[in-house]
Amino acid sequence: MHAGSGNDMDITRMTPTRLDDEPDAPEPETREDDNKTLNSPISELEGRLFDQRKVLIFGGINDKIARDVTGRLLALAGTSDKPIDVYVNSPGGHVESGDTIHDMIRFVDSIAPINMIGTGWVASAGALIYAAGRPERRVCLPNTRFLLHQPMGGVRGPATDIDIEAREIIKMRERLNRIFAKETGQTYEKVAKDTDRNYWMSANEAIAYGLVNRIIHSATELK
């Protein structure tokens, strides 16, 4: 959520609501030769991943990642109804961008089934994205860790506007808790209590919690 720029005394300024513990990373610089790498090894890798119907969600979650993942999912769903493998390794990021990817996974899954594969760490907004997959199609690699916690936001401005944004964050927290309760089978009360602080889980603990269906050790185990 963004507010307009202007005099700090009368304009509320809010950072996007986050689901992580990390500060915003600097945006990558756009170089003139970025569009001239069609034959580069990176482009070849992206092409092969696309042909194999694999999507990587690695790093912080922001609007650029959301746009890229949305485009890939829609393009893949438009070419075939075969399964799409989505790999998630993320510390989290902006809730709104996570919401976009979460909803798009649900949207595309009605056309082409999506396998969610957790690896590394699946934290915060990354866990929100991961939870978009069907329960039976949520898997992870053996050493994956998962983190659930409440959203955070920053705002400054008139006290009335700060109060409004604080209430919105509470609503967001309640909405996210409902999502995780539904997707894990836990009660809303338990999820609310667990996410009041950083709630870490190993792969096996995430299975017991209901977030992960099973651990896989090879690509041949994907359906």
Curated annotation (Swiss-Prot):
Which parts of this chain are annotated as the region Disordered? 1-40
Residue ranges under compositional bias (Acidic residues)? 21-32
Give the matching Pfam families: CLP_protease
Q: Where is the active site?
A: 124 (nucleophile), 149
SUPFAM superfamilies xref list: ClpP/crotonase
Q: What class of enzyme is it?
A: hydrolase
Q: What is its EC number?
A: 3.4.21.92
Similarity comment: Belongs to the peptidase S14 family.
Described function: Cleaves peptides in various proteins in a process that requires ATP hydrolysis. Has a chymotrypsin-like activity. Plays a major role in the degradation of misfolded proteins.
Q: What is this protein called?
A: ATP-dependent Clp protease proteolytic subunit 2
**What's the source species for this entry?**
Gluconobacter oxydans (strain 621H) (Gluconobacter suboxydans)
| Taxon lineage | Bacteria, Pseudomonadati, Pseudomonadota, Alphaproteobacteria, Acetobacterales
